[in-house]
Amino acid sequence: MKKDLERIITENQVDALWISGAAQHNPSMTYFTGTIHVTNADLFVIPGKQPILFHGMMEREEAAKTGYDLISYSRYPLTELLKETSGDQLAANAMRYKKMLEDIGLTKGTVMLYGNREFGPFYSLIRELEDLLPGIHFKGDYDDTIILEARATKDKAELEEIRKMGQITTSVVKRVQ
């Protein structure tokens, strides 16, 4: 149950969850955002705070459907960072994420990674971020312990969403037969 998430995060000695990637075909992101349509987003779940969703400027209306605190990537222009890094894409993106994390007060502790991103570039970004923010330790949840435990029970709103999706699925199957 999402309302138990803060307790589950704390019990697992984690300071934040970082869910990254598109909202579609990304079970961890969909669990938190619902069926919104964003092509790329970064969601940070920090105990004691409203979740924070970073999103593309053109996707702000979809992002707003989550009810989370929203920050557009446009607040962190890559063109300026690329100038500072002499065109180094990795360094510029790492600086961008460093500023994003600093702005949400996430500069130390353990951050559990979830989501669906291209592995190589994301791994390189995480390594670079660990150098820029030595107080943060990023780690993967190999068994999906935290999110699976949260998903194990449902509150009324989550049950209603499941029922709604079941009705949609049933209606589509009837039309196809």
Can you describe what each PLM-predicted range is?
Residues 1-99, 167:
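N-terminal accessory/capping or targeting/presequence segment of soluble
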